């Protein structure tokens, strides 16, 4: 009887061992299959604001298809969700922001996104609202500017260049300035900080507005043609728009394919002919 029980137990142990072994092989095969599938993934998903970023991406679709990739462009209308989606793994890259904004986003959110490569810059402009020119601006007039750190600095520097305000010494394009850094405001201007995407709509309610290049383009405004004054080109180049990815993925096959397609003569020609100075390539 003891021998019979021992034999049964030994058989059970043997069966368990075989089952465990079989499970390990199955799991290993599944993992290998998953890795292979990931390696075969030829869809590049990029988040972008509609104008000009999504339009520029779409101009590169054919070049990517020639390399065996499908480009999936996901459009966003604000400056936060494209980075959040990239951090969460919903995107392979995004294309909407300049380096100072990206650095500030990482700092404020504890994220680790990286600029994969440079693309273009969009000059900021001051646009007429209820007041038609800088010369006609009256005491106490209202001016709308973007409320996010790096772009607010950019707007304030432009107002300073226009002779409307004076900022503290040391404020430059890399600073994180607000209207509290204004030291002189001779016309007692009412400077209103609002979300960048709302700036074009604010023109009906304010005397002037300093508008980001992409949102100006969406409102059929061209900084080179329609603004009262555009920012210093040296400042503008500090704010080069980049394609961003998760840190460590800058040299991945997808990002390098995207770089090759976007930094092409065909895309440069498309940008020059389409935006006529409102978007300036840097490659």
Language-model regions, residue ranges each:
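Bacterial lipoprotein signal-peptidase II cleavage site
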Residues: 17-40
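Short helix-initiation/N-cap motifs at beta->coil->alpha
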Residues: 73-84, 172-201
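Ligand-binding "clamshell"
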Residues: 104-116, 130-131, 205, 210, ...
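A bilobed periplasmic-binding-protein/Venus flytrap-type ligand-binding module shared by bacterial periplasmic
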Residues: 123-134, 239-252
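Periplasmic-binding protein-like
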Residues: 153-160, 262-283
């Amino acid at each position: 009887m003891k021998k019979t029980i021992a034999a049964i137990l030994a058989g059970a142990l043997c069966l368990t061992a075989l089952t465990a072994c079989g499970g390990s092989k199955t799991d290993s095969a599944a993992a290998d299959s998953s890795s292979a599938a990931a390696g075969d993934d030829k869809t590049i998903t990029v988040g972008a604001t509609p104008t000009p970023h999504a339009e520029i991406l779409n101009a590169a679709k054919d070049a990517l298809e020639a390399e065996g990739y499908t480009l999936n462009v996901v459009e966003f209308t604000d400056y936060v969700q494209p980075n959040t989606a990239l951090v969460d793994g919903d995107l392979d890259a995004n294309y909407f922001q300049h380096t100072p904004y990206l650095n500030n986003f990482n700092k404020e959110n504890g994220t680790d996104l990286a600029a994969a490569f440079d693309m273009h810059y969009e000059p900021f402009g001051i646009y007429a609202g209820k007041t038609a020119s800088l010369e006609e601006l009256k005491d106490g007039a209202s001016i709308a500017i973007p409320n996010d750190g790096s772009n607010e600095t950019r707007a304030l520097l432009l107002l300073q260049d226009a002779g409307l305000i004076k900022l503290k010494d040391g404020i430059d394009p890399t600073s994180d300035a607000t209207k509290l850094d204004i030291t002189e405001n001779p016309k007692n201007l009412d400077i209103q900080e609002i979300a960048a995407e709302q700036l074009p709509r604010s023109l009906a309610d304010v005397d002037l507005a300093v508008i980001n290049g992409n949102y100006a383009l969406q409102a059929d405004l061209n900084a080179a043609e329609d603004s009262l004054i555009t920012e210093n080109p040296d400042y503008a180049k500090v704010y080069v728009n980049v394609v961003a990815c998760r840190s460590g993925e800058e040299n991945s096959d997808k990002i390098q394919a995207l770089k090759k397609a976007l930094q092409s003569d065909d895309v440069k020609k498309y940008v020059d002919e389409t935006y006529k100075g409102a978007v300036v390539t840097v490659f």
